């Protein structure tokens, strides 16, 4: 209810804007009396594009109606009687309005709540001490609104001038008719006697001279009025062009740029409501001026007076038609982009919207929108107005949709919910270009009739570039193409040109944005992380980020050529890091438990002076998406150890926290945080003992060289430690792998956890053996439940 309390404190223009949000579609009284209930409902949890959420929307509608009915029943007394009737009427009205379209109720209330919050936020910013210095964005919006007020006043002025011209011309025509009547009277003078004729003729001549003098003077006045009106319209159109340029070429383009960066994980592009309100104001003022110009043309045709006005009016009429054409075609936009990595035979969605649909009555004859997929070359030809003969580069199913007008929000949009790319036709590739570097775009096109079919516009808009894949394995490289395009595309480019090289700081910004979005973390890439990445990319050892600021990164370096000495590209390695964090380690990254971006030598330097049992987690150089444990432990042979990397597959079997919990000689997370303090909350609870006569096996992470160390450390027993061992045959009988710790340690200091050592397979084989002939006194063969790397599926 706090939101409604704040909304009631709005004043002036903000209060008027809030009042406009309400009407028959949702009365303000309902908002007032059900404020607490409305603000406590999960309106944002419903996906308006998902038909499966209709049931939840219906429940909210029913709940709203029930709450209104209850509120009505509780009204007593004389004052409560009228309110009871009114609330009951609103309950019936809302039920009838939204019964068949409950999603529209959700859309309406979300629209109201969003704008209420925006108005309250803007009011608070202006009234707070910090709001005295209005930020640049608010200042710009203020200037736009001031220009609209100026345009409104000018348009009202030309309306008054037009009315004055019309009244003056009507009186002129009356007097002109009087002049014609006098001329007719001259023709009738011959029927009078000479004395009467002379007397009458003198009076008529005096009247005619006086009237003709007046007509000449008034004709000049009319011409002057017409010229002045045309000149005022010229000035109005100049201001309109300037305002439209600010809104369409600045604000709308900035929104589209934010939408593009949001594809890389940037902040959401924001609501279109403010932009739509500006575009609607533009449309309203443009249309008013167009009607004025046409009325002025009609007056000139009604009473032709030689002069420059006809040419002036023809010019302003052509200009205002160009202005309205630019407005309509530019405000046909893609509100929800199709996925930029588009897999064939997979359902996808998109939403297009016309920001001026309501004001220009386009919705009175709902237009149909068609979607087709075209190549980069076809997009270039389209923008050059070359004849593409309706060419396309593939077939999209369910690619036609009728635009719908939502009365509550005033939006005209088409929701493509079930499109699917059936097939794709690729162009011949250039040089080293792969299929995941080829860009397409979804073309949306329609035809709009404006002003009772006075004007008809063919409108088209292109989606952000999409990369088409046919298999999930292509997703990572396709994402690299999209990331580079979204990050470094320049305004007004030829489709879909991007720089082949960018500065390292530019790439850092794009990587950090993508990283935080993928990992869903506010903990982005630090200066040290970026230095590590620069060292990896440029194969340089400098530890100063500034040394890399002037260095350029080419697309080939980013994701075409392998890194020196490795069989993967820079992007593939970085993408693997994001994937393993996203799937398995988001909480650990957010806790700061994963240091990550350090190499083996850096890990050595960090751990060398730390107490035994101190460890850190870093991203592997040798395994894409791998995480390895480096730790300090003094022994006769060495004091620093590295475990062979774990990958996503390993963490799907046993979590990182549980693996660390198994290794009791790992005590401190670098630099000095107790391991259990960091990871204990993520340990899997110990299973209860079996009660059905069966023993449940459990995997335990063990490094053979440290079995004694683990025992000496006083490890708490796991379930497998506590459970009685199953009766097994002697090791030679089953050809089990003998304990052989020597190969586990590789020559450069990493444990090589043999992939062939699959404990799960042997456990399953063992449990399938007949047990009758086995000696119950025999214990499991050595090494059966211990291995440096174990898995149980």
Curated annotation (Swiss-Prot):
Domain SH2 residues, every copy: 589-686
- Give all Phosphoserine modified positions: 128, 779
The record describes its post-translational modification as: ISGylated. Tyrosine phosphorylated in response to KITLG/SCF, IL2, IL3, IL7, IL15, CSF2/GMCSF, GH1, PRL, EPO and THPO. Activated KIT promotes phosphorylation on tyrosine residues and subsequent translocation to the nucleus. Tyrosine phosphorylated in response to constitutively activated FGFR1, FGFR2, FGFR3 and FGFR4. Tyrosine phosphorylation is required for DNA-binding activity and dimerization. Serine phosphorylation is also required for maximal transcriptional activity.
Q: Where in the cell is it found?
A: Cytoplasm; Nucleus
Q: Which Pfam families match?
A: SH2, STAT_alpha, STAT_bind, STAT_int, STAT_linker
Q: Which GO terms describe its molecular function?
A: DNA binding; DNA-binding transcription activator activity, RNA polymerase II-specific; DNA-binding transcription factor binding; phosphate ion binding; RNA polymerase II cis-regulatory region sequence-specific DNA binding; sequence-specific DNA binding
Which InterPro entries has this protein been placed in? p53-like_TF_DNA-bd_sf, SH2, SH2_dom_sf, STAT, STAT5_CCD, STAT5a/5b_DBD, STAT_linker, STAT_N_sf
Question: What UniProt keywords are attached to this protein's entry?
Answer: Activator, Cytoplasm, DNA-binding, Lactation, Nucleus, Phosphoprotein, SH2 domain, Transcription, Transcription regulation, Ubl conjugation
Q: Which residues carry this modification: Phosphotyrosine?
A: 90, 682, 694
Instruction: Please list the tissues where expression of this protein has been recorded.
Output: In the virgin, found in most tissues except brain and muscle. During lactation, abundantly found in mammary tissue, as well as in other secretory organs such as salivary gland and seminal vesicle.
Reported function: Carries out a dual function: signal transduction and activation of transcription. Mediates cellular responses to the cytokine KITLG/SCF and other growth factors. May mediate cellular responses to activated FGFR1, FGFR2, FGFR3 and FGFR4. Binds to the GAS element and activates PRL-induced transcription. Regulates the expression of milk proteins during lactation.
Q: What is this protein called?
A: Signal transducer and activator of transcription 5A
Species assigned in the record: Mus musculus
């Amino acid at each position: 209810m706090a939101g409604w309390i704040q909304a009631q404190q709005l004043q002036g223009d903000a209060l008027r804007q809030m009042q406009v949000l309400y009407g028959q579609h949702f009365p303000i009284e309902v908002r007032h009396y059900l404020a607490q209930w409305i603000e406590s409902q999960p309106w944002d949890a419903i996906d308006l594009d998902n038909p499966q959420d209709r049931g939840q929307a219906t429940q909210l509608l029913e709940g709203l109606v029930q709450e209104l009915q209850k509120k009505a029943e509780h009204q007593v007394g004389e004052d409560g009687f009228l309110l009871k009737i009114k609330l009951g009427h609103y309950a019936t009205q809302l039920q009838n309005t939204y019964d068949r379209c409950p999603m529209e109720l959700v859309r309406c209330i979300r629209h109201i709540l969003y704008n209420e919050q925006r108005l309250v936020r803007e009011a608070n910013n202006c009234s707070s001490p910090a709001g005295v210095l209005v930020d640049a964005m608010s200042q710009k919006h203020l200037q736009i609104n001031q220009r609209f007020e100026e345009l409104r006043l000018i348009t009202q002025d030309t309306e008054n001038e037009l009315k004055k011209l019309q009244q003056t011309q009507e009186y002129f025509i009356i007097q002109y008719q009087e002049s014609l009547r006098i001329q007719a009277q001259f023709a009738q003078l011959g029927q009078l006697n000479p004395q009467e004729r002379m007397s009458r003729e003198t009076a008529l001549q005096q009247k005619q001279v006086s009237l003709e003098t007046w007509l000449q003077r008034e004709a000049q006045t009319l011409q002057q009025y017409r010229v002045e009106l045309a000149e005022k319209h010229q000035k109005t159109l100049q201001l309109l062009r300037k305002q439209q340029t600010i809104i369409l070429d600045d604000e709308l383009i900035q929104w589209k740029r934010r939408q593009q960066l949001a594809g890389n994980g940037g902040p959401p592009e924001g609501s279109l409501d403010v932009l739509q309100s500006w575009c609607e104001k533009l449309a309203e003022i443009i249309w008013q001026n167009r009607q004025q110009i046409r009325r002025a043309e009609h007056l000139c045709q009604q009473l032709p007076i030689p002069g420059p006005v006809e040419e002036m009016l023809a010019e302003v009429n052509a200009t205002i038609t160009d202005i309205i054409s630019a407005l309509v075609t530019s405000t046909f936009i893609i509100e929800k982009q199709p996925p930029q990595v588009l897999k064939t035979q997979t359902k996808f969605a998109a939403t297009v919207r016309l920001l001026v649909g309501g004001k220009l009555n386009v919705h009175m004859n709902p237009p149909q929108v068609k979607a087709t997929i075209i190549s980069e070359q076809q997009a270039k030809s389209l923008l050059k107005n070359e004849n593409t003969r309706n060419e396309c580069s593939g077939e999209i199913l369910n690619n036609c949709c009728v635009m719908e007008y939502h009365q509550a929000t005033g939006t005209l949009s088409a929701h493509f919910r079930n499109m699917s790319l059936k097939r794709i036709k690729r162009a011949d590739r250039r040089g080293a270009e792969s299929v995941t570097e080829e860009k397409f775009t979804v073309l949306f096109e329609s035809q709009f009739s404006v002003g009772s079919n006075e004007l008809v516009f063919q409108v088209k808009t292109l989606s952000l570039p999409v990369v088409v894949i046919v298999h999930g394995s292509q997703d990572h490289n396709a994402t690299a193409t999209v990331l580079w395009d979204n990050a470094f595309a320049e305004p007004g480019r030829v489709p879909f040109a991007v720089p082949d090289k960018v500065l390292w700081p530019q790439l850092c910004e794009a990587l950090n944005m993508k990283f935080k979005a993928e990992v869903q973390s506010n903990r982005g890439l630090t200066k040290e992380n970026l230095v590590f990445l620069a060292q990896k990319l440029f194969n340089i050892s400098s530890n100063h980020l500034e040394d890399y600021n002037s260095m350029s990164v080419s697309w080939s370096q980013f994701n075409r050529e392998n890194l020196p000495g490795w069989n993967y590209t820079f992007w593939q390695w970085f993408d693997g890091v994001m994937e393993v964090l996203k799937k398995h380690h988001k909480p650990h990254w957010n806790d700061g438990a994963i240091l990550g971006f350090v190499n083996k030598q850096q890990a050595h330097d960090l751990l060398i002076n730390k107490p035994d049992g101190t460890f850190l987690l870093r991203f592997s150089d040798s395994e894409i998406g791998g995480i390895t444990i480096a730790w300090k432990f003094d022994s006769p042979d060495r004091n620093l150890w590295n475990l062979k990397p774990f990958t996503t597959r390993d963490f799907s079997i046993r979590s990182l926290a549980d693996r660390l919990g198994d290794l009791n000689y790992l005590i401190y997370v670098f630099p000095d945080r107790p391991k259990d303090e960091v990871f204990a909350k993520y340990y899997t609870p110990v299973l209860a003992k079996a009660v059905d006569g069966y023993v449940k096996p459990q995997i335990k992470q063990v490094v053979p060289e440290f079995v004694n160390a683990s025992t000496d450390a006083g490890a708490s027993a796991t379930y497998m430690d506590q459970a009685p061992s199953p009766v097994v045959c002697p090791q030679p009988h089953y050809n089990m792998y003998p304990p052989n710790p020597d190969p586990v340690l590789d020559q450069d200091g990493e444990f090589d956890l043999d992939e062939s050592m699959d404990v799960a397979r042997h456990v399953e084989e063992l449990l399938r053996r007949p047990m009758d002939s086995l000696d119950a006194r025999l214990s499991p063969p050595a090494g059966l439940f211990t291995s440096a790397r174990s898995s149980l599926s």
